[in-house]
Structure formats: structure tokens, C-alpha cells
Amino acid sequence: MVTEADLRRIYGSIGDDQVSIGHLASAENIDVRLSLDALVTRHSAILGSTGAGKSTTVASLLRSIIRKDEVQGSPGARILMLDIHGEYTKALEDVSTVFSATPNQDQKPLFVPFWALEAGELLDFITGGLSEAHEIAFTDKIVELKDKGIKVNPRAGIDSRTLTVDSPVPFSLKQLWYELVDFETTTYIGANRDEPALEESGDAETLVAPKYQPHAMGAKGPFTNTAARGIRRPLNLLRSRLLDRRYDFLLHPGDWEPDLKGTVKSDLDKLLEGWLGHDKQITILDLSGVPSGVLTRLIGSILRIVYEALFWSREKSEGGVERPLLVVMEEAHRYLGPDAGTVASEVVKRIAKEGRKYGVGAMIVSQRPAEVDETVLSQCGTIIALRLSNPVDRARVKGTLPDNLAGLMDLLPVLRTGEAIITGEAARLPVRCRITLPCQKHLPRSNDPKVTQAWASRRSAEGYDRVVASWRSQQTNAVVQKLEITRSPIEDEPEES
């Protein structure tokens, strides 16, 4: 017979690296603890259908990891969360710093400098895709502008000999557009056809193109530039992107936006310090305001910046070896699909395969494990599986487990909300666990709408102009017209004598 004391020794062992996440589903007085070291360094996955309690499990687990309620705690914990739907900003507000593309007064603005992206990803976004010949025209000019930039502002670790098109060196997209459009539209006059027929010089800063005399037939010209690459269409799209306010967090990144000479107020060290070096244990990157067309690229860029920085600084005190980092990836199936082939997918595969050596751990969170790359999922040493109804998803989870544990997955369709089967390196034995619920004010913002209550209420005045304003601005808190209210004290009228 297994006694309660035996169960407590098996599942509730106490140690420096043990964190409590809940209790046995069959015995509420027996805690379930996981090894923090194994949970972070050997990666983990939290999987479950919509409504199974994934978000609550993540919020509860992160609070357990940082040990806020313990005397010693984990003041040096470092967790980076990619929050796709903005669910965790309230749930973790007391232990996190929030960066958002559409920040409110309690959040910091999220900026991801475009010049830190790989050239291929950047060009694919700002031009809509290029042929090989057209891409060369852009990459050659980017290298030229970056080279000019490091000559004006020398940067540690790089010079003209080691510079590549992918080097994270500031350059001006406005200057790139201006110089390329100038070359494409130039016309010439003169006997040797080498005198530019310029009428107005334009302005790179305001994205006004230079104006040349129009091409004319005959011996006098003006003559077109025969060396032009035929890239006016992608240049027009680049200009449109630069003018689109929805992409300011990427193309106009605050202090990280280069001027026309490539000079920036802040370098990447300040960006990393903001994300990873503040006084809270958790950093939430709220991506709910990011347009879907750029979301995957943005996530890939964030992960690349963070991982490359920690990889190359592994011998330093700020590196991952001295101060490990846990990256929590919500809605992972959206950017880690088996056929994704994106920067995000490639970086996460690197983290999954080699992150343990450099102190970077991954926590994959998904409602569709079947749509997550098998390489990534198979590298997760700990599986926290909540209710899963889809047989394809269950089969994918089964495939990550040893044969003798596959039978446990037959329980997944009947688990209660907030119940999970935990297997892997962080758990001493496979266990059916009831996850500890955070208090009401620390629950994620993922509740279903109260349909009956909402439909039973009398309709109030509806302003669909506000709906359209939010749609156009891509901000949920947009207003139709800002009102200025002037408040002045009321003066008593003099009494009649």
C-alpha cells in the first residue's frame, strides 16, 4: 500500500530547485513540485485546447518560478514572454515590465529596430518580395549606407572589412529610398548624356522624390538612365510602409531610428537593457497591437536579437550562462509550424537544440500541438498537457513520450479545466496535477464572453464611428475626436446688499 507520506515524498520533495505548481488531482493536501533547473534548461511545453486552462497554468507557473511569495525568492530570475493576445499584462503586472506596440500609460513602448533584422526578412516586408536582380540593387545600397554609418559613428566589434548586409548596424530607410528612387528616375541631357536634368531635388526626410525633366524622344533628350534596375514598384511600397503609422514600432523605432547619416540616439545595448535588465523578473512583450502581416517577422527578429546577444555574451555576467533566460512563447503554432521556414522557426530550433548550453530555455505554449514543428516539440524535456480533444493533437503529444507513457494520453480528453498530466525531466514521476489558481486579480484576461448576460441586457447607444476609428488606427483605445476639457473654479456671485 502506498501511504500519504510516500506520495508526499515522491511528488512533494522540497529542495532549492523545486517549485510548487499545484496538488495531486486525487489528493489536495499533497503538493506537486517540479525541478526549476530541468524546467528551464531542458525546455518545456504547455499544451491544451481552448478553454482547458492554458493561460491560467502559464500565469500560475511563472509566479511559482519567480517564487514571489517565498522569503528568499528568485530576484535574479529572467523571463521574456511573447504575449500575442495581451492576456498577461494584468495577470502579472506586479512582477513584470510590459512593452507594447500600442502602449497605455502603465506600459512602455515596444520598439524593434528594423536595422537589427536580417536583410532578407526586412526586404521581404518593406518591398513585398524581390527578384534576385532587384534584391542585389537593395542589398548593395544597404551595405553602402551601413559602411558610411560606421565611418561616421565607429562601433565596437565591427568595421568595413567585417561588415555584411545582415550586420546589425544602423542605416536610414529614408535615405535608402531616396538614393534608389533618384537613380531610377534620373534623366540626362548634354552631348555626352551625363548631365542630370534635375528640376527639384526632393527631400529624403519627408519622402519627397527628386523631380527630373521627363524623357523625350530625339537627339536632344532628356534621356533615361539606361542603368536603372526597374525597381519603382518595390520603392513605392517601401515609401507606403514608411508612411503607415501601424508600423512605427519597427520602421520608426524611437531613439533607435537612424537619421539620414545613420546616427542613432541609442544602440542595441539600451534595447537589451530595457528588455532584460530592469528590476522585475518578467518582461512581457505585448504584441496584441501588431498587424498580423508583420507579426511572424517581428517575433523572429525579437528572438534573434535576444538569442544572438546571449549566445555571443555567454562568457559575460549578462550572458545566459551566468543569468539564464526563459523565453515563453504563447500561440506558438502561429509561427512555429512545420513548414514555416521563418526566422522565428529557425531561431527557436536553435534554442531547442543548443540553448541549454548557453542558458536560454524555451517554454512552448499552444492549443494546436499538431501544428508545432516536431523538431521543436521533441526537444521539450517536460510536457504539461491539459485537456486535448483533437485526436491529431493527442497523437502528436504521444509521439514525444516514451512508449510506456503513451497510455497516459488517453486521459487527455476527460481532464477537468485546470488539470494537467505532467511528464518529463522536471517531474520525478508522471503525475495528474490540479494547477494552483492565481487569485482573482491575477487571472489572465482570457475569459469567454458572458453571452446570456450580455444578450439579456438592454442595448445601449452604440457608436460605430468608434469601431471604425479603432479599426483604422489599429488601436483598441482609439477615439473619434479628442476633447479638451477646461476645468475652472466656480466663483460665488456677490450677495445683494
Q: What residues fall within each predicted segment?
A:
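Conserved AAA+ ATPase small/helical "lid" subdomain
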Residues: 136-158, 410-441
